[in-house]
Amino acid sequence: MIELKDIVVKFGDFEALHNINVNVKEGEFFTFLGPSGCGKTTTLRTITGFIEPVSGTVSVNNQDITHVPIEKRNIGIVFQSYALFPTMTVYDNIAFGLKLKKLKKPEIDQKVREIARKVDLSDEQLKKAVSQLSGGQQQRVAIARALALKPDILCFDEPTS
């Protein structure tokens, strides 16, 4: 399902990834383990499209997506820092991507409430600003936001931090 072939990523003269090759089959869970600074996050950001490699290809289901924009990849990501909007409500954070896809309000509402229940966020919590939640609750909001878009692939950067 996911194939990285000969991926090279550079930041200036620094080569962060050198000829990375990875194959992950459909249904598999895959973990990158390694010390800080070894390229785990860079690899995830390359898969999701936040970083474009200097060379090599990123393929999903045998389709080259190396130059496909982030919003067209249908890959979700939960960032290490969650990347939530702290002054927005939990509801609006989860609904953010759904609104960008221009779904109708009733459909957004149904999807937000359904996914919130799945990650154990109450209707009362949906009304709160994200900044009012604990770290664990914020992590669940980030997971819900990623799941709301029904991605084919879901990436977690430092999921236990």
Go through each PLM region and give its residues:
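Conserved catalytic motifs of ABC-family nucleotide-binding domains
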Residues: 150
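Short coil-to-helix segment of the ABC ATPase nucleotide-binding domain corresponding to the Q-loop/switch region
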Residues: 88-97
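Helix-to-loop junction immediately C-terminal to a conserved catalytic motif
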Residues: 48
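Hydrophobic anchor residue at the start of the ABC signature
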Residues: 143
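Conserved ABC ATPase signature
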Residues: 129-133, 137
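Conserved ABC ATPase "signature" region
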Residues: 64, 106-124
